[in-house]
Amino acid sequence: MYLLRRALQAAEEAIKGSEANKYQLWNTEEYPTVWGTEASEANPGEILFEIVNTTTESPGNESMGYLTSPKGYQDMCITVSFYHHLLETPNDVRIKLLVNQDKKVMYLNKYQPQPGENIMDANIPIVRLSETYLNAAEAAVKNGDATKAAKYLKAIALRGNPDYTMPAKVTLDDVLEERRKEL
């Protein structure tokens, strides 16, 4: 129980510290288009930590952007079952991150290059504020704090799908389901 309380406390401290430094969750309108945009001091977005990847530092043909892009190797695609799962909630904004090449294979379009660069120069998001919210929701569920679990889950679920209906009581399965869609 001690570790669960500490996990929730750590997640909440990370959220408060991030938001105090102007990091914020992307809103529903921003979410599909913000990948690959440059953060600024005034608007750092929700990526808390990312690996900067340019062809100067690494061979671009092995970058996440190149591996996951239909314009690259096309090595990483989503499963058919995950695609059909996302289609069950057609108003979920995260569906807009999917790109298809030939209607047979779907790619996740999260590894975008910075403006003016090519797909080989896509940075790799490691930790996002949304993941921290989901960590807090999971720790709250495991700690029996239904109010905090609902608070953190709601922020991510409604951002992803404005038609989302919050369950009467948030369960671990609810949090894991949202994590599956978000990350």
Give residue ranges: language-model regions:
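Helix N-cap / beta->alpha transition motif
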Residues: S69-Y83
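Acidic/polar-rich alpha-helix caps and helix-coil junctions
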Residues: M1-M64, Q74-C77, L87-L183
